[in-house]
Amino acid sequence: MQKKILIFPAGTEIAFEIQNSLKYSKFVKIYGGTSASDHSEFTYENLITGFPFVDDANFLDFLNNVIDENEIDCVYPAHDSSCLFCSEHADEIHAQVIITDKTTTGICRSKKKTYEFFQSEEFIPETYATPDEVINFPVFIKPITGQGSVGARKIISRSELDMNYNSDYVICEYLPGAEYTVDCFTDGNGELLFCRQRMRERIKTGISVRTRSMDTDDAVRNIANRLNGKLKFKGAWFFQVKKNLNGEYRLMEVSPRIPGTAGLYRNTGVNFPMLTLFVFWGYPVSIIENDYDIVLDRAFYSAFRIGIDYDYVYLDYDDILTLGDKVNADVMRFVYQARNKGKRIILLSKHSTDIHADLKKAGISEELFEDIQVLEKSEEKSDYIKETDAIFIDDSFAERKKVKEKCGIPVFDVDMIESLIDWKS
């Protein structure tokens, strides 16, 4: 039986990584929960809106009502604040929470608490309790409860420190060296099964948008073992380090949750969100990883909500299903998606050679189409479209214009196919 998993908040990069890691699993059915209008509206088939924010007094009651009404089995927190809330209220939440205990989560949520807890360790950067303790510049300030590099900045003078510092910040030594994220996984017995370092090559709004796998330094592995020995991690977690002037690693932060860029190692075979579920369900786990170099780079992509209903898809063959001698994989994605939704697909073409032979050569099954119609050059495609609940896809402007004018249905060029893709499917 599938277990129902509620990811909250559903619109963070962490949430999308959890969703991408679980969406093909036969073990789970995914639900999303959101407090805001965000990209989750385009990616979750089962999205529950209207959540209060996690610091709202009514949040717990709302969450429990959602859990009860939808028979949710597990809540997968996807933001540092929701991780802390779920760990602190685990006994009150009507489902299993996929986060470790509140002591570990509380220490990780506050950089001040993290540095105080590990103050005897040499990998902790030098910190200053007040601006008056700072003698040499530059130094670095960052929010006590921030995440990533958001709100953090280099301070080069006392006047700049006085202008920017308040009690919500921690003051640290400036670390000029390279920055790394270290992805880790701890099983249900507290054993560190996975520890891999990666380079944060490009960062945007505190999120690593280009990251590269690399060999894990022994010093980094030692830090991981010491963190794992003193805190109670369960499943996936990560920490970030940076080198000081002497080339020594210093801890920047540690988090007990899924890293937002976990997709890097997911694509070497290590599915952190799924493995974490197995650990929380009490299953023994092991890890198999493909040994190759891999780089992850990401940017904004577009998802569309298009206001049309249709049951029929008419599309051309040349320069639509194929581009030169290659199959257009993006169009085929749409074709299979339409077929899965029960749309009736008609191939309407003026193909000059044997279309059946060419479909076979391209590896495209004729079973995808309800009908295959090959027209003479002199015939009009608009004469063959009778339904009004249809769309027409063709690279020819002249053909699209005639169909639009005569049939009054939406028409699409090949570059518009992306607007027809349903990312919830």
Regions found by a protein language model. Give the residues of each.
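ATP-binding N-terminal substructure of ATP-dependent carboxylate-amine bond-forming enzymes
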Residues: 1-98, 413-415
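A conserved helix-loop-beta module that forms one wall/lid of the active-site cleft
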Residues: 88-158
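ATP-dependent carboxylate activation and anion-phosphoryl transfer catalytic cores
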Residues: 70, 215-222, 226-311
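Acidic di-acidic motifs
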Residues: 10, 316-318, 392-396
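Substrate-recognition element of Asp-dependent hydrolases with the DxDx(T/V) motif
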Residues: 331-360
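Phosphate-binding site of ATP-dependent enzymes
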Residues: 153-231, 242-250
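Conserved Lys-Pro-Asp/Glu-containing loop-to-beta segment of HAD-superfamily phosphomonoesterases
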Residues: 380-398, 403
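Asp-based phosphoryl-transfer active-site loop
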Residues: 310-324
